[in-house]
């Protein structure tokens, strides 16, 4: 049995094994709810079934119009039933099952709080409370492992899914914001909260649809909303200090150190983190601020194609990352609310130092008509990246009608790079055409300062508002570097020429930008309004690139290469205004409007002593429509238009040969691109049944799309130049359906995505159409038994077909299959065993790049000391030692298959100690956090 069949056999066997669990459950518990005074049935009340021994949730449902409920396929045992209804006192009823197949609970009467003289508040609360489209889960009914984080708790919630990167979906809808006690945690990154806060610190998880800031400001629903989660902390954690210290080391020479502390004093929160590792764990996202373009405009398109990145692995270590990184980072976040709750303040600081070692090899098939060739490349590089970033937000409410928000930021960056690259180019008959060896180095630094001021004013009349946003930014970048290239040229495999390129370069870029807008809304009745807006934006930049050739006489780089040297000043100005109409009805809301935009570019090429001036005027219409079939079923249609202006780099007719194999030159005749985009989304869910259906359709077309015009020079160097084309469009769609299987304590999800991209480009002077069709079905299965076992199975297929009109030899078909299995066993003696298996298979690539990659990771944890504060873990990454990195890129004239180094097999022993001190005392379990990104 080969590796591919073995992996598929293991995956299917696991699925069948799990599917056989739990079929012995055959009891039914049923009853009905009524008002104790009016004797009327209570429709849509929440009924939860929990285990009597520990209150962990078994299932939950809602009553029908007759007030009836039932739970099917329940195992014999002792239970409690919780019933809750808005305006009524919650109630708990014990259930003891025997040998009967149906347990009749009869009538359960509930008391209206308004008819009672006194209400006794008990410590036991309902596991689930539903109010409209919001759901509240009580954490005490969901069991997690010792020292679990919020992410582990969310995985236990009905209808919630958490992917390996930490992304959260609730019944198919992506969660975009996570709040802690109503405030965003650590600059609003939801992953920071769910991956780091301890699960036992959370009292309630509240899930709701959050309206847009503009809708909350005007009071008129604009149809824009996002799914949000609020984590309400336990009372004793509102005044507490908690954190975690983690140290791990292993073979071969791997280490992972992390530490953090959180201090919460009601509204005041302070978090500090630090870490160092060489396992490709990145604690902060990279924010590249280096910019030599002088500002303005967009970036060149590649002329169409598809890119597939492919490697095995899963878990905290980034197995897919190219290269091996050694990372050091520290950071902090402070937030507080003061001045009688009128002022919210947040500040954060992050410092990181990353050094990445990259080793790669590639095989390029360039199939340009009349100039086809193959190229083999090998490259080694060491790249360093240091960043220091500070950000802050001050949100002040002057009174009920006027507020402002000020957001300053400051960032610094320093980079170094050293690379060695060797390339051999062969004709299609196998003869060697040339061989290049390049050694290059560079050092760069940059500073970026920005600020935004938002002013908001409400008037007495509801819906009448005025707001303004003023922004400012400044960027300065500097770089110096050296490049040495030796090119050996051959004729009939015999050396014909040996040329040397030995240069030093300096680059400088500076950009200042300012913008302001003004928005006024005027209500039309109670459910509609008109919005008027105007804006002005200006960007002033300068760009300098000076190239010096080596002077053999002086052995210095003092010969200015005027052909490659360029200095340019530019000024971009955007201005315009528009209006829109919004209406919010009971079942639907819609908006329609337009804006007028004028863009003016003035540029001066100091080196060539030439000037450039361009001006564009556009009308940009937009429209949105939302229809609510019910609180959990809706249809959204969104139409937008936008423009992309050419960048200064794209407009300058100056040669850039920093890449000896692919050189570029700008085009001063470029026009702006005009984009039409249509997005349709349908969503339906049944929260209690755990069912969700979600589908999307996105279509876009671009006029004057900016693509690359590639020409092949006699030595097979590619010269690329941006040009405008029409006819580019793309259509993408997806369907997802998920449902819970209460009998198996499981959830099953299916997905399908498909796409059609029609790209226009030029293949060595010939207008070319590249059509890419793609489709990909997927499936996931989750099986969870509290304190016993968690199992997650996934399968994903991805098929892509590319056709090339001018050059059919570039037509490609390739298939990627990925199977995954994750299992966590909670064993006696406070032992936890975790395993993950990923099996990735790809076909349709160049020889040597069709691989099957099985990745098996495992860990063994033991918790000890009082309250399980300490953990010792033995973990193994890539037990089979099979991890590799592969990348395929299909563009307008070539196919590039590339392999690169990735993190390989290692074994690590880790010790973790949790810190926790509660200001109010109490018996809460100690918690902690370990920063995971």
How should each PLM-predicted stretch be described?
Residues 52-68:
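Short, acidic Ser/Thr/Gly-rich low-complexity loop/linker segments typical of extracellular
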Residues 223-245, 354-380, 384-397, 401-428, ...:
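Surface-exposed extracellular loop regions of Gram-negative outer-membrane beta-barrel proteins
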Residues 51-56, 78-94:
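A short, solvent-exposed loop/turn motif at the edges and junctions
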Residues 25, 66-68, 89, 96, ...:
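Membrane-proximal, glycine/serine-rich, low-complexity loop/turn segments characteristic
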Residues 37-51, 130:
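Short, ordered, surface-exposed loop/turn motifs in non-cytosolic proteins
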Residues 778-796, 811-933:
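Conserved C-terminal beta-signal and adjacent last beta-strands/turns
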Residues 378, 513-515, 559-566, 665, ...:
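Outer membrane beta-barrel strand-and-loop segments of large Gram-negative receptors
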